[in-house]
Amino acid sequence: MSRIGKLPVDIPEKVDVSVNDNLVTVKGPKGELTKEFNNKKVTVEVKDGQVLVRRVHDKDKDARAFQGLTRSLIDSMVEGVTNGFEKKLEMVGVGYNAKKKGKDLELEVGYSHPVIIEAEDGIEFDVEKNNKIVVRGIDKQQVGEMAAKVRAVRKPEPYKGKGIRYEGEHIRRKEGKTG
């Protein structure tokens, strides 16, 4: 059996999970997430305050993988509607700063013009000390994608380390020209 897939997902008190055929809906204090699982190899059911993901055929290797994947996605949905997710980014460089304009994010990262990143539905930006950016939301995948879009505006370069990086990310530095 899949080690992750066989574990049940516990449903907290304030969270409601419903399953209709392939559609799983999770409602909680922070919002509502819906995901469709179009996989015939696993079934999802809610029983005794837990979500159980079961394989249709025990011997199928793909079914084991999909069981673990489905369980992890449902667990992330439950976590998102209860606590939410956040990714922190930091800006390194002289004159690099960020401002929040309404819901959107304005970045000044060494270009001749400021770069504006529009917040998608369900995403919230926070700016701390003009050089730290926090991306928050209830959908783990969406938060990660928005953080990657912000980072892609000015990726960290290996010579001086300037750019936008994830908090705690280590940038391998190069030596540069010698002689």
Curated annotation (Swiss-Prot):
Similarity section: Belongs to the universal ribosomal protein uL6 family.
Keyword rRNA-binding tagged: yes
Name the UniProt record assigns to this protein: Large ribosomal subunit protein uL6
InterPro entries recorded: Ribosomal_uL6-like (IPR000702), Ribosomal_uL6-like_a/b-dom_sf (IPR036789), Ribosomal_uL6_a/b-dom (IPR020040), Ribosomal_uL6_bac-type (IPR019906), Ribosomal_uL6_CS (IPR002358)
NCBIfam families, sorted: L6_bact (TIGR03654)
GO cellular component: cytosolic large ribosomal subunit
Function text: This protein binds to the 23S rRNA, and is important in its secondary structure. It is located near the subunit interface in the base of the L7/L12 stalk, and near the tRNA binding site of the peptidyltransferase center.
A single MF term (Gene Ontology): rRNA binding
Disulfide-bond pairs as recorded: none
Keywords of this entry: Ribonucleoprotein, Ribosomal protein, RNA-binding, rRNA-binding
SUPFAM superfamilies: Ribosomal protein L6 (SSF56053)
Pfam families hit by this protein: Ribosomal_L6
Species per Swiss-Prot/TrEMBL record: Halothermothrix orenii (strain H 168 / OCM 544 / DSM 9562)
PROSITE patterns with a match to the protein in the record: RIBOSOMAL_L6_1
Subunit organization: Part of the 50S ribosomal subunit.
GO biological process, one term: cytoplasmic translation
